[in-house]
Amino acid sequence: LASALTFGAVVATPAQAATKVGCIYVGPPGDLGWTYRHDIGRQAVEALDGFTTTALENVPEGPEAVEAITQLAETGHDLIFTTSFGFMDATNEVAGNYPDVKFEHATGYIRAHENVSTYSGRFYEGRVVQGYIAANVTKSNKIGYIASFPIPEVIRGINAFMLEAKKHNPDIEVEIVWVFTWFDPAKEAAAAQALIDNGADVIAAHTDSPAPMQI
């Protein structure tokens, strides 16, 4: 009887700990762009059973990023998303010290450790659509492009935009203004104004704030 009771018993196990997911943002979720969409995803994960999330926003690219990523790794986060290209070196540096933590880096190309992965989107497809629209609505045949940094992701977008525009309107001129920032509303607005002053009547932007649209 004792054996039967033992065999039929259900052994209680401790509840599984929640998976902790961290996000490092280069700007604020209120940018209505890149960081905003990442944070929508974070909120969706937070709503799932068995997950908790943390977001650190307005983290500069550089030594501060190392500190922020380390903070998440030290506080028990199992998966960390570093959501800006400029976090690439910091991500790989910290990942080497925390082999049990998984790291996902946005739009990068260096995966120095087995626990580092990269992700991106086919953003150039949207740029093709923008180029088509620009070619068909411009009156001045001058269009502008506000670009953040000269990295592969951004250059792919410029090429897609420009090639599609010229395909439908060979007389179009494309002027590019580099702002060397992802999120700086003042710089983005100034770039848009400069393009307008030079005759552009259609402007695309690969930056994070809506400032160019508010000119």
Each model region followed by its residue ranges:
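Boundary of Sec targeting at the N-terminus
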Residues: Q16-A18
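Structural motif
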Residues: T53-A73, F180-L195
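Flexible loop/hinge segments that line or gate small-molecule binding clefts
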Residues: G96-S120
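C-terminal segment of classical bacterial N-terminal signal peptides
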Residues: A4-P14
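Ligand/cofactor pocket segment of small-molecule handling proteins
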Residues: E164-I215
